[in-house]
Structures are given as structure tokens and as C-alpha cells.
Design a protein with these regions (language model features):
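Glycine-rich phosphate-binding loops of nucleotide-dependent enzymes
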Residues: 2-248
Length: 248
């Protein structure tokens, strides 16, 4: 089967004032895969995800999705689609720190994730699918999301993103601040989303071992630069990766 390139990031750079957050980053995400990006805190991983959805403007390079230009710098000018168009095209981001709407119920949070949908029957069906997939959310659907545990809030953040039926799911540190068993549960759900719902996944994660074990392909970022790229199983055996990120 021929691999289809769903997301192409070509030589992009992003600045924060005088600080170069990303420098000449290039990478591909093939349709149907789980791709992991690992690196130390502050390496630029979250900035890359924000650039993909248009929250951080490029100063160089381009981002293409499903063969269509999303963002590019041409003649030193940044051109790109508004963020809501990115969602409409089939890209959903689960941000770092979950960022659920604390004063809304679980069900109302899911409604917020369905803002692009107009069919009430479809919205209802999508919510039921999420409650089946994350049973604890179904049990808590009338509770304010502030009352959920950290793991439950992360499940809600993923479910909210899935309400838009994305083809590409971006996850920013889904295991951040969670107990190891909960992180494993979250990643098992991510694999099911990929395998059963046929959603392509690009995950940024500091838990390098779990991220790479769950992925087909992997990249390593240091100081805003991609320094390694290989199949995830090969990166798990790479001595530099093992020493720097796996604690070996």
C-alpha cells in the first residue's frame, strides 16, 4: 500500500520576538499513522503544533495538509487560513494542560467541540459515541468539568476534539501531570482512535518511551531543530535517544 502524505511541514521557522523558537523544521505525517515528536521541555514542540493550526505565524516555510496549502511565507509575507477553517478541513488540537471549560458540564464541553456541526441528530450521535468510548464521561456527563480528575479531564479534552470528526488529531503532552497508569490508559485510547476510527495522530509527549512505543514514526527536537527522524521502533533502540530521553 502506497503511503499518502497527509501533513507536510517544509522548512518552517517561528520567532518569539528575537528568539528563534523553530528553525528550518521539516517533517511529514502519513495518513493512518501515529507520529510522535519528543524532546526536552522548551524544545519548541508545542510551538510546532500551534503553527500547524495557525496560532503561531511562520516567518519562513510552508505547511501543507492533504495536498492543500494551509500556511506559507511568500515574498516575506505570511499567508494562511483562519483557525476555524483548519478545524473545518479536518484538523483538531488537544492543547497542553487540557483546557476544558471548567464551569461547563461534560456534555456542554462536548457541545463546544461540535461547533462546526449543524445537524442536531449527528451531534447527539457523536456524544453517545464519546460516552461509549469513554464510559466515565457518560457517568459524569451532567457534572461540571472542574470536578473531574486530571485523567478524566484529559479524556474529555480528547473527546471534545473528536466531536469534529477529525482526520488528523494533534495532541500536546496528553500525559502531562498524570499518574503513569492513567497515562497508559490515555495512550491506549489514542491507539484505538487511530486503529478503529482511522484517525491520523501526531502526538507531542515528554514520556518518550510510551510515545514511541505507541507510534509508527518518530522525530526528536532540540532547540527548535529536528535532530533525528526514524521509525519509532528504531528510535527506541537509538543510543542517543536512550541516553537523553529514556533514562538509560
Amino acid at each position: 500500500m502506497t503511503e499518502k502524505e497527509l501533513l507536510k511541514i517544509d522548512n518552517i521557522s517561528v520567532n518569539y520576538g528575537n528568539i528563534k523558537a523553530l528553525r528550518g523544521v521539516s517533517m511529514n505525517v502519513n495518513e493512518g499513522e501515529i507520529v510522535a515528536l519528543i524532546g526536552a521541555n522548551g524544545a519548541g514542540k508545542s510551538t510546532l503544533l500551534k503553527a500547524i493550526v495557525g496560532q503561531e505565524p511562520l516567518v519562513e516555510g510552508s505547511i501543507t495538509y492533504d495536498g492543500e496549502m494551509l500556511f506559507e511565507v511568500k515574498d516575506k509575507h505570511y499567508h494562511g487560513a483562519p483557525t476555524y477553517n483548519v478545524v473545518k478541513k479536518g484538523i483538531a488540537l488537544v492543547p497542553e494542560g487540557r483546557r476544558v471549560f471548567a464551569d461547563l458540564t461534560v456534555e456542554e464541553n462536548l457541545d463546544m467541540g461540535a461547533f462546526m456541526l449543524k445537524d442536531e441528530a449527528l451531534i447527539k450521535r457523536k456524544k453517545e459515541e464519546m460516552f461509549d468510548f469513554f464510559p466515565i464521561l457518560g457517568q459524569r456527563k451532567k457534572q461540571k468539568s472542574r470536578s473531574l480528575s486530571g485523567g478524566e479531564q484529559q479524556m474529555l479534552a480528547v473527546a471534545r476534539a473528536m466531536m469534529s470528526s477529525p482526520r488528523l488529531l494533534l495532541l500536546d503532552e496528553p500525559g502531562l501531570g498524570l499518574a503513569p497508569l492513567i497515562v497508559q490508559e490515555i495512550f491506549s485510547k489514542i491507539k484505538l482512535i487511530n486503529e478503529e476510527d482511522k484517525v491520523t495522530v501526531f502526538v507531542v509527549e515528554q514520556n518518550a518511551r510510551l510515545a514511541l512505543k505507541s507510534s509508527n514514526d518518530g522525530y526528536v527536537m532540540e532547540n527548535g531543530v529536528i535532530v533525528l527522524h526514524d521509525e519509532a521502533k528504531a528510535l527506541l533502540k537509538n543510543q542517543k535517544v536512550r541516553a537523553a530521553y529514556l533514562g538509560e
